[in-house]
């Protein structure tokens, strides 16, 4: 019996060793792939394309107990989604960057759908940094959001940083049914510490009950229309952001327009919504202004 036990133990040890070797080989392969991708020689580029294409998808639905489930949570390449502990009956998803980027020529997209009565919070684990790549093509980052009647979405990612030499176009389209609730924060930082910004174009389009609620576009950096850094636009500031809050109760009482800080203001929109626009010298000061505005609206 002792001999059989020893043989089985040796076989198990060999099996564990084989599994460890397989895991090490897989990890090495994944690491090599990521390093090649960062050098501009990844699998997608090797097939003759100019960048990496990836689409992440989230769908939230209310369950029988009144909580929120996620029947769709699809990561793709550099866009990794992770469910984390949420607030109350809301689900919470974090977007984790599994690779650097977007780089030149990349095509990233995030699609989010919130069903009737569902509540979803979406954030990110770190800032997104647009970087130059070997490909000189423009990179794109598209966000598509759909919130049904009675659904609620809090979209609160970290900042987007436009690094020197990068070229990125961001397009966000939000479609809200009547009775939907939304908190949407967008923050952009022009250049890392001590460097000039890259080229950044960003458009935000929001429809409420199929009618335009907000449609605005900003362009900054090399190649942007003249005056983007002048006193009528950024005035030398390097962090810009906005907070859009849509709530059905605003139909009865819409917050009054007011100045929140020297370079920040709250503006009621033609619908049950308010827009907070802010400029700041850095990302930390910008976040403080937007957080304070949201706290006042939540209070």
List PLM regions with ranges.
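N-terminal intrinsically disordered, cationic/polar leader segments
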Residues: 2-10, 51-76, 148-151, 155, ...
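Transmembrane beta-barrel architecture of outer membranes
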Residues: 105-109, 140-142, 167-171, 199-201, ...
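A structural signal for small-residue-enriched, beta-sheet-centric alpha/beta enzyme cores
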Residues: 186-299
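Short, structured patches in soluble enzyme cores that scaffold and shape functional sites
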Residues: 114-116, 124-126, 147-149, 157-159, ...
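Long, intrinsically disordered low-complexity tandem-repeat segments
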Residues: 15-43
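N-terminal, charged/glycine-rich beta-strand/loop interface patches
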Residues: 2-18, 42-159, 164
């Amino acid at each position: 019996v002792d001999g059989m036990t020893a043989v089985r133990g040796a076989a198990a040890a060999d099996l564990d060793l084989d599994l460890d070797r397989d895991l090490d080989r897989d990890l090495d392969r994944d690491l090599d792939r990521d390093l090649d991708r960062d050098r501009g020689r990844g699998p997608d580029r090797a097939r003759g394309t100019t960048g990496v294409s990836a689409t992440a998808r989230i769908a939230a639905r209310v369950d029988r107990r009144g909580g929120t489930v996620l029947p769709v949570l699809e990561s793709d390449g550099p866009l990794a989604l992770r469910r984390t502990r949420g607030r109350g009956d809301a689900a919470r998803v974090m977007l984790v960057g599994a690779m650097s980027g977007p780089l030149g020529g990349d095509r990233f997209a995030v699609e989010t759908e919130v069903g009737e009565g569902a509540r979803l919070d979406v954030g990110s684990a770190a800032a997104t940094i647009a970087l130059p790549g070997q490909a000189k093509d423009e990179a794109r980052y598209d966000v598509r959001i759909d919130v049904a009647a009675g659904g609620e979405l809090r979209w609160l990612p970290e900042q987007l940083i436009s690094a020197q030499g990068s070229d990125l176009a961001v397009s966000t389209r939000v479609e809200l049914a009547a009775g939907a609730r939304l908190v949407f924060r967008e923050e952009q930082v022009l250049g890392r510490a001590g460097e000039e910004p890259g080229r950044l174009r960003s458009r935000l389009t929001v429809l409420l009950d199929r009618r335009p609620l907000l449609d605005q576009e900003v362009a900054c950096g090399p190649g942007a229309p003249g005056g983007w850094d002048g006193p009528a636009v950024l005035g030398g500031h390097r962090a810009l952001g906005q907070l859009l809050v849509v709530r059905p109760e605003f139909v009865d009482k819409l917050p009054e327009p007011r100045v929140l800080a020297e370079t920040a203001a709250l503006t009621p929109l033609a619908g049950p919504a308010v827009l907070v626009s802010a400029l700041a010298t850095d990302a930390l000061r910008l976040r403080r202004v937007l957080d304070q505005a949201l706290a006042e609206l939540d209070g």
